From Swiss-Prot:
SUPFAM superfamilies xref list: Trypsin-like serine proteases
Official protein name in the record: Serine protease filzig
Family: Belongs to the peptidase S1 family.
Subcellular location as annotated: Cell membrane
Gene Ontology molecular function terms on file: serine-type endopeptidase activity
SMART domains xrefs: Tryp_SPc
Segments traversing the membrane: 48-68
Length: 1693
């Protein structure tokens, strides 16, 4: 209801403003609405008007609560504490269910679901713990992917359309009333305008403060208020009028010239400007007024009051959440242009109220600036883009008044372009920027603060970045495109659309959103999205994705258009020209814009029309562009958002494609919840600042920071006046890491602009740009988890600053920068482009530049500032801080700088080409990220920006830098680049984002189309993906931003490849992206997915699938290669195998391969060897050859099945492919993952033949053979045979193995084995040899498992007597000896019942696969045997394995029963035991205590149960029963920090001591000074077999090398994460991510064998970013560090 009303009212407003006169009235209306309280009487004039006002008020009222509710939701939902004191789902992951249905996010980009379900839907887990699969993790589904499949989405779409129609009607009705009201209001606004300049600063600050407080409801409003009448007018008009304007604008915009400029500028600034325009355009009559506006600070004042009350304003905030989804705004926007894409709608509503919020949410800050500019541009709009550009600066004051009325529609677009200039000349504009920041801030603040404030951390847990994104995303529930919901951008677009057409509108929207989206990205950072673990750590998603959606949106823009990328590069240079040529070269510009997904936005300002043309030109790309519409509005924002949230961050990044890919999944994380916190602190600081004029911006910033995402959007809305600030938004993007910070920066910048620039000095705009920068930073952060992103972020900030000078350009530049960055980082980040912008008109600046005046301004700004630019940068960073007022004051900046420092460094790097590469370095990036994450860090970041300012001065360099940024990722990007030349920057980021990218690209095309149509088309593209997007898009429909994603999705299929590249950059992060990687460049990307960890790898992968494979191969080892080669795409598709057809094929192939691979180990073998080879202690794969024999079987078996079956990456091997491609496809995991060694295979084959022969007659001989040769040799052979046997089975098994080897095995084993075993067992008994022989045969049938068992059996047989004399037999015997009882299961000992035995055997076999492998390894040190024998007195023994005779288990496969007797399964029981789920792993250390992870603490009203001696959780394959004990109490480490997983350790005290047995043995504690660095350790658990994969039924084991902490830290940096590896952490895994622990393994043991054959506990599974992702090794709690604590409680020695 609420939503509906809001839409209606908004729509009404919108309607009213639609006509030119209406525009004026709208302005008034908006103002009136803004000051509903103040001007209620006036509103009475027109009944409709009063009604509209009433609705607005109601909306405001509802929004305020809603906002509060949202906050709480953010806090509650986001902070949902599922487990003990910490919420498993990232805060941004508030499950869609918690969102109002109207919330676009409710579509489910982030839904609480099991990780494997998430993976199946191509989503990205943004907030899962290692045990996420057990509980539900925040799954960010690529809008395209998931939404499409979501009924809700469809419903939403339908609703949206319906809503839009209704809204239109309402709007038309309200239009008339609003017109009169608007006129009325306009006069007021005009009056106010005069005072606005003086009051601007103060009001802004005050408003900011007030709004920050109001945050949710006021927040939006404040922008208007902050702006004062004019701002409000603009904003409001933006909202109300925008639609009008849009309509007008459509026609006006229609004129390509005007449209182009208007669209370009307007897109980002349009909304903001709209209000201005209303003053201007609306005021044809009010022309004077507009002039006055700049002069009237009072307007601000009045607005302040009204703003506070302003319904529209406040609704937008809520809208972000509710409205966003709600069509309300969209309807308005629909009127506007349907630019109000559904996705954008929410923001749009927010925006609508403050148009900027949504659209410019990210860009809106820029818009904010621009709004002022807008006004100026307004007159300008009439002029050609070029003229506009020039006029902007020059004419701004004059033309504005003059052309105001007429240009209004176009002007908006033009304004957008001119915004920067406008802002400079116009004080109003400038104040507006300030207000805008305030609004943005508020919006963000609302969301961000809340999220940031408390929830931040949580996200961090899973995915810091995601968290941050989520936080911001909160507004956008999932942070995918919809969130950005910058309805505004769409609006602008709408206006633009007129000029260009819907398409352009779309494009504009997308692009604009880019700017705004940067901010929104921040806001968007919802996701989360973080990949699950990645989501957890990084996102700990991405990636993302989940998060894909946003990403998609964003990404698309980024390289939605090939041009986008180009724009980045070319546009940088070209853009300026284009900008100027805007109209004439629209198409080209479009290309440029294409280049920048976001860049487009930036470009948009300059050449919205062009963009549209280009979009038209490149429909597919266009989609991207269109997407940009959504994307910018949300693309960028979303990008950031998504990225942050879901890898979506990556997705967003995709917009920035280059950056996003790099961090892809990590980006999300990087966006760092940490960044959030930083933001928060910033916010707080900024909160103070708001007091000052700078404060306004700062306030905004503050809000921004706090609710960067939300606020950003909202702020954007508020700042609608300050489009330039939108640039700031990009800054935010740039700071994405500090997402909030960045946002804030932008905000602050705006403020600075306002205060400092005065209106004339567009430095004020610089801050807006900074704002963008901020946003960009955010995006970058998100996008870039990679250093690129971050640096970009910095850069963006810097850029943003300059843009401040040229708000419109800033905005545009933002995009440009972003694009450039985006290329490298997130398009938004590219905002940094602004840096280049000044100088590199060439790059982004060009885009901005086109704004001519703006460009000049921009440039001048940077130049004037050179110090100023620097300052701007500082300010930008600083801006966030107090610098706001001191934008000019670089000094203040410094503080900000400090915050930005890191980014700065990054930026610096980024800026410097060299720098960029460095950013490319995850380390730098990470730092940036870190900076973002830590408020303090941000300070540093900011500081650095100080330096960057210099660089900023040389934006050109930065531009190059960006390119260079791209360079690092260049490989990827280049590929991407190839796809979209402009995208080159993409190259920088893409690495990380790589995988995300894939998916998103496809989407854009679809989106573009429907985006084009605005609402209706919105849903059309990519139904499935688009469906997902649809809902999003639909939401976004109003605002193209949403469409953004869809376009990406649209391209998903093959086109995806083509488009994907575009998407890729932005989308790269998206986890879904993996699959989507199809982007043309993506094909390689898929592989990239596989290699997400290493940037380099990504790059390579990026290059081409083959390359990818190679890369993987080289990086990973053969195994990777094999797998990638075979499944390069598959991998990528893996996630979306379902989503994308490609995957299936691979899967099939893989399956075949599995068998084949198994058989043809050479192929996969390389891949597996990497996986498996390492798995065993044996580093060499050849060694595995022996063990691999069985192992291979096992692995192969496990691999396919495991991957398919269990998401747990417990089987890192499985995860190998997943790592890069993160379980891109089942095949991926299956065939390649388990290829062990060719030698093994050969042996197996030979053995199999032998076995077959022997089975027929010489089973005894076989057994003897096994025993005599020294279990090792024989065993190996035997096993090999078994393996061979298994192999054939395996083929079948492979499929079956969905559960992967383990499951399959168990199943096969269980069923077949039992029967066979039983039958055979007797035979066996009769003739042990004979039986054995037979059994193997049976086993064979069973699947390799049996064979494996067979091997064991022989051992077992001996073991029968083995207990006494097991030395020889020991190998097998040992394992079996303790077996005696166990023997039957492991051996075919007649002692135990055959069936059981068989079953167990099977289990053993399964285990055998892992365990057999171990046996194979036949670490003959049958040390175990001794333990086995000794085991009879388990009470005195620890670390022994009575059931296992072989030394080690080769990793990544099912282990054997009793192989890890200390393994505990921690289950959670809820509802009095009605529901139980496997939550985590654990380690038995004494008869009464179990160690697990702190994040495994029980949820609300839940209790934990510890199951000892468990092996097959699906059935009873064990010879011995497991023992279940209730947990009496959970002792969580006091210093446990869910945000960083510090001290992630907990002790479970059992209600009664457990009786030790052969299958229940405690683990030994390591020596206090033990150092396991460089050794191979074994991780066991029932966690997912691969990231996003399924869960195995039998215990899985994986061998991983323990890495030195410093190396681990470096690896994380390389992957673009700034995660700090503490001394209490222990890292284990491979650089190429072959194997790793995964969700569900949490709390499980990481053990090593001591010289005496016993096993000791090196660490417990804690967390990781994704699972087995390149350069993201798993993180464990170092046992030696916690021994004192453990000893103090348990007394263990």
């Amino acid at each position: 209801m609420f939503k509906w009303v809001t839409p209606a009212s908004t729509a009404t407003l919108s309607r009213c403003t639609l006509p030119a006169t209406t525009a004026a009235t709208t302005t008034t209306t908006a103002m009136a609405a803004t000051r509903t309280a103040t001007t209620t009487t006036r509103t009475t004039r027109p009944q409709l008007l009063s009604i509209a006002l009433t609705s607005l008020i109601i909306i405001v009222a509802s929004f305020v609560p809603t906002t509060s509710g949202f906050r709480s939701i953010e806090t509650n939902g986001g902070g949902r504490k599922l487990f003990g004191g910490y919420r498993i789902t990232p805060k941004h992951c508030r499950a869609t269910k918690t969102l109002p249905s109207s919330d676009p996010r409710a579509n489910g980009p982030t839904i609480c679901m099991f990780n494997h379900e998430c993976a199946q839907r191509g989503g990205e887990v943004v907030g899962a713990c290692m045990d996420g699969f057990l509980f539900g993790a925040c799954c960010q589904i690529p809008p395209t992917h998931e939404l499409a499949s979501t009924l809700i989405n469809e419903a939403q779409n339908a609703y949206f359309q319906q809503h839009q129609q209704q809204t239109k009607l309402q709007q038309s009705a309200a239009q008339s009333s609003f017109e009169s009201y608007g006129e009325q209001q306009q006069s007021l606004s005009e009056e106010q305008v005069a005072q606005q300049p003086s009051q601007n600063i103060y009001d802004q600050q005050n408003l900011d403060k007030v709004y920050q407080q109001l945050d949710s409801s006021s927040s939006i409003s404040p922008p208007n208020g902050a702006y004062g009448d004019e701002p409000q007018q603009q904003e409001y008009q933006s909202e109300s009028e925008q639609p009008v304007r849009d309509e007008n604008a459509y026609p006006t915009s229609s004129s390509s010239t005007e449209a182009t400029q208007s669209q370009s500028s307007s897109a980002s600034v349009e909304f903001e400007q709209e209000p201005s325009q209303p003053a201007d355009a609306s005021n044809d009559q009010t022309t004077q007024k507009i002039n006055k506006q700049p002069v009237q600070p009072p307007n601000f004042h009045v607005h302040k009051h009204s703003v506070t009350i302003n319904s529209p304003s406040s609704p937008p905030q809520n809208d972000d959440f509710v409205m966003q989804v709600l069509s309300t705004l969209p309807p308005e926007h629909a009127d506007d242009h349907h630019i109000v894409f559904t996705t954008e709608v929410p923001t749009k509503i927010t925006s609508g109220l403050q148009d900027q919020t949504s659209s410019e949410s990210n860009s809106f800050e820029e818009v904010s600036s621009t709004p002022a500019a807008t006004q100026k541009p307004k007159p300008k709009p009439t002029q050609m883009p070029t003229q506009k550009t020039t006029q902007k600066a020059t004419q701004k004051p004059t033309p504005k008044p003059t052309q105001k009325a007429k240009p209004k529609p176009v002007p908006q677009l033009a304004e957008s372009m001119k915004r920067p200039i406008q802002q400079k000349p116009q004080q109003v504009a400038k104040p507006k920027p300030s207000p805008k920041p305030a609004q943005s801030t508020n919006n963000h603040h609302h969301n961000h603060l809340i999220l940031d404030g408390g929830e931040f951390t949580h996200s961090d847990i899973t995915h810091p970045g995601a968290d941050a994104d989520l936080v911001e995303d909160l507004q956008f529930s999932t942070g995918y495109g919809p969130q950005p919901v910058y309805a505004e951008p769409p609006k602008q677009q709408q206006q633009q659309q007129p000029a260009e057409q819907s398409y352009i509108s779309s494009s504009t929207s997308a692009k604009r959103p880019t700017t705004g989206h940067n901010s929104p990205t921040t806001v968007s950072s919802i996701t989360t999205h973080v990949d699950s673990i990645e989501s957890i750590i990084l996102q700990l998603n991405n990636t993302s994705h989940g998060p894909s959606y946003n990403v998609v949106s964003q990404q698309t823009p980024s390289y939605g258009y090939p041009g986008a990328a180009v724009v980045q590069t070319e546009p940088a240079a070209q853009n300026p020209t284009f900008y100027q040529e805007n109209e004439s070269e629209k198409v080209q510009e479009s290309d440029s814009q294409s280049d920048y997904g976001y860049t487009t936005t930036v470009n948009y300002e300059s050449f919205y029309d062009k963009v549209s043309d280009e979009q038209d030109a490149s429909a597919a790309v266009s989609q991207s562009a269109e997407m940009p519409t959504a994307r910018p509005g949300y693309g960028e924002d979303v990008s950031a958002v998504l990225e942050d949230h879901t890898m979506p961050a990556n997705g967003y990044h995709d917009a920035e494609a280059p950056v996003a890919p790099q961090t892809s999944e990590f980006n999300k994380m990087p966006v760092m919840g940490i960044a959030y916190p930083v933001d928060m602190s910033y916010m707080e600081e900024e909160g103070n600042l708001p007091a000052t004029a700078a404060g306004y911006g700062q306030m905004s910033s503050d809000s921004y920071e706090a609710s960067t995402e939300s606020t950003y959007q909202k702020l954007s809305t508020v700042q609608t006046e300050e489009p330039q600030p939108t640039y700031v938004r990009p800054t935010t993007n740039a700071n994405k890491q500090n997402r909030p910070v960045a946002s804030y920066i932008g905000m602050v910048t705006m403020q600075h602009y306002n205060p400092q620039p005065g209106n004339g000095d567009y430095q004020a705009q610089v801050p807006p740009e900074v704002s963008v920068s901020s946003h960009t930073t955010k995006v970058q952060e998100q996008m870039d988890e990679t250093s690129n992103g971050y640096q970009q972020s910095e850069t963006t900030s810097g850029y943003v600053s300059p843009p401040t000078a040229v708000p419109a350009p800033a905005q545009r530049p933002q995009y440009d920068a972003v694009q450039g960055d985006a290329s490298s980082e997130r398009p938004v980040l590219v905002t940094a482009s602004p840096r280049p912008r000044p100088k590199p008109s060439t790059k982004r600046p060009a885009v901005k530049r086109p704004i001519s005046g703006e460009s000049t301004k921009k440039k001048p700004q940077p130049q004037p500032s050179a110090g100023a630019y620097n300052q701007e940068k500082i300010s930008e960073h600083s801006t966030r801080k107090p610098v706001s007022n001191g934008y000019d004051k670089v000094p203040e900046s410094p503080i900000t700088h400090i915050q930005i420092k890191k980014p700065s460094a990054t930026q610096h790097k980024e800026q410097e080409q060299t720098g960029y590469p460095r950013p490319a370095s995850p380390a730098g990036y990470e730092q940036t990220t870190a900076a973002a994450p830590a408020p303090a860090a941000p300070s540093l970041n900011y500081d650095k920006p100080d330096a960057p300012p210099s660089q900023y001065d040389q934006p050109s360099a930065p531009s190059a830098s960006y390119d260079q940024l791209a360079p690092m990722p260049s490989l990827n990007y280049n590929e991407q680049h190839a796809s979209s030349p402009g995208r080159k920057p993409s190259t920088a980021k893409p690495i990380s984002t790589s995988y995300v990218t894939g998916p998103s690209t496809p989407r854009p095309p679809a989106t573009v189309d429907y985006h084009y149509d605005n609402v209706p088309p919105l849903f059309m593209a990519d139904d499935k993906l688009d469906a997902f997007i649809q809902s999003t898009a639909e939401n976004i429909v109003g605002s193209t931003p949403g469409n953004y994603q869809p376009p990406l999705v649209a391209t998903a299929s093959t086109p995806a490849y083509a488009h994907r590249p575009t998407s890729s950059g932005s989308y790269g992060h998206k986890k879904p992206g993996f699959v989507q990687i199809n982007g043309t460049p993506k094909p390689p990307r898929p592989t990239v997915l596989i290699t997400p960890k290493p940037t380099a790898i990504n790059l390579v992968t990026y290059s081409s699938l083959s390359d990818d494979s190679n890369k993987l191969a080289s990086s990973t080892s053969s195994y990777v290669t094999g797998r990638p080669g075979v499944q390069g795409v598959s991998s990528n598709d893996f996630k979306d195998p379902g989503y994308f057809g490609s995957s299936p094929v691979h899967v099939a192939f893989t399956q075949s391969t599995t068998e084949a691979v198994y058989a043809v180990p050479s192929d996969d073998k390389p891949a597996f060897p990497g996986y498996f080879g390492p798995t065993p202690s044996y580093p060499a794969f050849s060694v595995p050859g022996e063990k691999v024999g069985q192992n291979v079987m096992e692995e192969t078996y496990t691999s396919p099945n495991d991957f398919v079956n269990f998401p747990p990456v417990r089987n890192p091997n499985l995860n190998m492919s997943a790592a890069s491609s993160a379980v891109t496809s089942d095949l991926d995991l299956s065939t390649p993952a388990f290829v062990e060694d060719v030698v093994l295979k050969d042996k197996m084959h030979t053995l199999v033949h032998k076995l077959v022969a022997s089975l027929q007659g010489n089973f005894e001989a076989l057994a003897d053979m096994i025993e005599e040769p020294g279990s090792n040799k024989t065993v190996a052979t035997y096993q090999a045979g078994a393996g061979g046997t298994a192999k054939p089975v395996r083929v079948v098994t492979t499929r079956k193995p969905v559960r992967t080897a383990t499951t399959t095995r168990p199943k096969v084993t269980t069923k077949k084995p039992v029967t066979r075993v039983t039958t055979k067992a007797p035979n066996k008994k009769t003739s042990a040899v004979s039986t054995t022989t037979r059994k193997p045969a049976t086993r064979r049938t069973t699947v390799a498992a049996k064979v494996t068992t067979t091997t064991r059996r022989p051992a077992t047989k001996k073991p029968t007597r083995r207990v006494s004399s097991t030395v020889k037999t020991t190998t097998v015997s040992s394992a079996r000896p303790a077996d005696d009882e166990i023997v039957d299961e492991e051996d075919e000992e007649d002692v135990n019942p055959n069936p059981s035995d068989n079953e167990i055997d099977q289990g053993a076999t399964l285990s055998s696969y892992g365990g057999a492998n171990g046996r194979k390894i036949h670490s003959t040190s049958r040390t175990l045997p001794t333990p086995n024998l000794a085991f009879h007195s388990p009470s005195t023994e620890c670390g022994v394995r009575p059931h296992v005779k072989s030394g080690r288990i080769v990793g990544g496969k099912g282990s054997t029963f009793g192989a890890y007797p200390w393994q505990v399964l921690v289950r959670e029981s809820t509802w009095l035991g009605l529901f139980t789920k496997n939550k985590c792993g654990g380690v038995l250390i004494t008869s009464r205590y179990v160690i697990t992870a702190a994040h495994c603490q029980p949820g609300f009203l839940a209790s934990l149960v510890a199951v000892m001696g468990e092996f097959d959780i699906s059935g009873d394959l064990e010879s011995k029963r497991s023992v279940t004990k209730n947990v009496k109490r959970v002792i969580v480490h006091r210093q446990y920090d869910p945000a960083t997983f510090e001290n992630d350790l907990a002790l479970l005290e059992l209600d009664s001591p457990v009786q030790f047995d052969t299958h229940i043995v405690p683990i030994c504690m390591p020596n206090d000074v033990a150092d396991f660095t460089g050794r191979m350790a074994t991780v066991t658990g029932w966690g997912r077999l691969k990231y996003g994969g399924g869960v195995p039924s039998v215990l899985q084991e994986v061998q991983v090398p323990i890495i030195e902490n410093s190396v681990c830290q470096e690896m994380f940096h390389t992957a673009g994460h700034n995660k700090k590896i503490l001394t209490s952490f222990l890292c284990a895994g491979y650089a190429n991510g072959q194997k790793d622990s995964c969700e569900g393994d949490s709390g499980g043991p990481l053990v090593l064998q001591r010289p005496d054959g016993r096993y000791e506990l090196a660490g417990t599974v804690s967390h990781g970013i994704k699972c087995a992702a390149p350069y993201l090794p798993g993180v464990y709690m170092r046992t030696t560090f916690y021994k004192p604590w453990l000893r103090s409680i348990t007394g263990v020695k």
